[in-house]
Amino acid sequence: AVATMADLAPCDIVVEAIVENLEAKRSLFKHLEEVVRDDCLLVSNTSSLSITAIAAACRLPERCGGFHFFSPVPLMKVVEVIDGVRGAAWVGECLTALARRMGHTPVRAQDTPGFIVNHAGRAYLTEALRIVGEGICAFHDVDRIMRAAAGFRLGPFELLDLTGLDVSHPVMESIYEQYYQEPRYRPSPIARQRLAAGLLGRKSGHGFYAYPDGRQQWPEPPPVPA
């Protein structure tokens, strides 16, 4: 652990995982360049933002790359390795080797909105929110069906609660805007309203589910008609 930015000076690689906001990340990378050596890799854990755009704020954009882990990191072994337009080939190669040394499975991805997983998996969250918004069924029924019938370890609303709407909703908005407001990526007003209400998920103690004592509480099933 470090106490100040200056403590990062001897590092060979710095992985950023701050708020999913382009300007915040660009500002941080610019500051990091004033601290670390010129051969230090500056890497972002962004799940949706352009590595090229983040690196553009840097004096040495060729040493920047993307290194996107999935939550929970100890269980989710895939990590996306992303090359920016001006990124040097050796950066991606170093990140690929590092991921393997960490026991993860690296996958090289192009610098496109959402990369691979958050692009391919958009429908898992957005369609689940749309189903609930249209009144087709309750959110916990969607989760139960996706776990029992489709074999997912987490239903979409459990996943939203685990990640936190303060992370998930900005990612939805980012991908929607980066694809020029493609309708199939449109975020849900349900997520926006719950984010405004502070119902973030596990981290706030209440999201789609309640978490008394940190444990997920499933809604009571409706009574069976006599």
Language-model regions, residue ranges each:
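Rossmann-like NAD(P)-binding element
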Residues: 1-42, 49
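Short acidic capping loops at alpha-helix termini that bridge into adjacent secondary structure
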Residues: 10, 38-39, 61-63, 140-141
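NAD(P)-dependent Rossmann-like dehydrogenase/reductase catalytic/cofactor-binding core
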Residues: 100-111, 133-134, 139-226
